[in-house]
Structure formats: structure tokens, C-alpha cells
Amino acid sequence: MDDIIKRFCPRYDFDSYEDMKQNFKINVPDDFNFGFDVVDAWADIEPEKLALVWTNDAGDMARYTFKDVKDNSNRAVNFLLEKGIKKGDIVMLVLKQRPEVWFIITALHKIGATVIPASFQLMKKDYVYRINAAGVKMLITVGDDDVVQHVRDSLPECPNLDRQDP
């Protein structure tokens, strides 16, 4: 863990708040990629280290290691590439707070695409505006009936959005 942190923050132990304000620095390489440089690097060093815990109101729980996040994000990369997503594309996510959000966001980082997280409470007009204003190429959403209906209603007004699986 220290190796990963030191790669980007040469100093992270400080004597005081003033010391931190004066001396804290983050080194971000030009080719930095969070998916590869942090998530995958951590998975390579400590594959079984806990990365994510998910729970819901019903008491269900899922635990994911860094290896799980790496493997699931790599599967998501393959899916997104098959669907035509490439570096520079913009993808909107409406996935509530499910674990898949983190796998897909990490995958989009690995590809070099931009992610726009969006609320499941959006209405048709909100989708139309956001999709067109941002040039969204793909929208990935939960299967909730209301969300799906608002997305379907917005499609005729969103010419940039690929319509592979409406």
C-alpha cells in the first residue's frame, strides 16, 4: 500500500495542519490512469484486500476485494469495447448505488472514456438535456420501470446516443 501512495504522494505523514498545508503535494503523471495505476496496482500487490462493501436497506451485503474490482472492471472493459466505446467517449450511468457502478467507472477510466453519473430521479427532459449537452454516446441504466420509460421517451430527441439496447 505504501508503495502506491508514495508513487503519487511522496509525503503523507505530517507534524501539523500547517506542515501539511505547506508541504502536501500530489504527483500525477501525464499518463495517470486510476483504473490501472491504483485499482489494478493494488490488486496486484494485495489481491484479497477489501476494496468495497455494499449493503442495502434489506440487509443484503456484498464484499469485494481489489482483485474482484480488477476482474469485474476488466469484464466491463470488454463489454464496453464490444459496444464501441473508446477513449474520449462520454458515458452516462444511472445505476443508483450498486456495486456495478464502481466496476463500470473503473472500466471507463481504463478505456479513457468520461463518465457522467446521474440520478435515477431524472425525467425525460433531464435526460434529453444532459445527453445532448454532453454528447453522451452511451447510457447505462438500472432496469427500474420508471427509469427505463423516461430513457425510452427521450431517445427520439437524442441523436448522438447509440441505440443498441433501448
Regions found by a protein language model. Name each.
Residues M1-Y64, D68-L81, E157:
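N-lobe entry segment of adenylate-forming
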Residues D3-I4, E82, F103-T106, K110-P166:
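Structural core segment of the AMP-binding/adenylate-forming
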Residues F32, A58, P99, D144-D145:
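Residues that cap or initiate secondary-structure elements
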Residues V39-W42, V69, S73, V91, ...:
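Adenylate-forming
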Residues P47-K49, G88, L161:
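A general structural motif
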Residues G59-Y64, N78-L122:
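Conserved AMP-binding/adenylate-forming
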